[in-house]
Amino acid sequence: MAKLSLINRDIKRAKLADKYAAKRAELKAIIDDQSKTDEERYQARLKLQQLPRNANPTRQRNRCVVTGRPRGVFRKFGLTRHKLREMAMKGEVPGMTKASW
């Protein structure tokens, strides 16, 4: 089990990223727009830099929904390889069966 503080930190980052997603997209559109003046684009870049660092979605970490482990997480299931195997063997993952050939 991961430390609760780390799990909560990631949850907080996800909420912050959702909160600022529209504003970030708007500013990035201005920055990428070649028809805008250099001054407007520069001001948009400064405003983007003023946003909280944790509002950037790349600072989030995929974590297992059961254990909070940050590595070996399958995106499709939201589980680490350990928990995925354990739950699949118990039949708790719909549609997943043990391979045999």
UniProtKB/Swiss-Prot annotation:
Biological-process GO terms, alphabetical: translation
Entries under InterPro entries matching the protein: Ribosomal_uS14 (IPR001209), Ribosomal_uS14_bac/plastid (IPR023036)
Alphabetically ordered keywords of this record: Ribonucleoprotein, Ribosomal protein, RNA-binding, rRNA-binding
Gene Ontology cellular component list: cytoplasm; small ribosomal subunit
GO molecular function: rRNA binding; structural constituent of ribosome
Keyword Ligase attached: no
Entry annotated with the keyword RNA-binding: yes
Residues in the signal sequence: none
Matches recorded under Pfam families: Ribosomal_S14
Highest taxon, organism lineage: Bacteria
Recorded family membership: Belongs to the universal ribosomal protein uS14 family.
Function statement: Binds 16S rRNA, required for the assembly of 30S particles and may also be responsible for determining the conformation of the 16S rRNA at the A site.
Subunit and interaction comment: Part of the 30S ribosomal subunit. Contacts proteins S3 and S10.
Name of the molecule in the record: Small ribosomal subunit protein uS14
Native source species: Bordetella pertussis (strain Tohama I / ATCC BAA-589 / NCTC 13251)
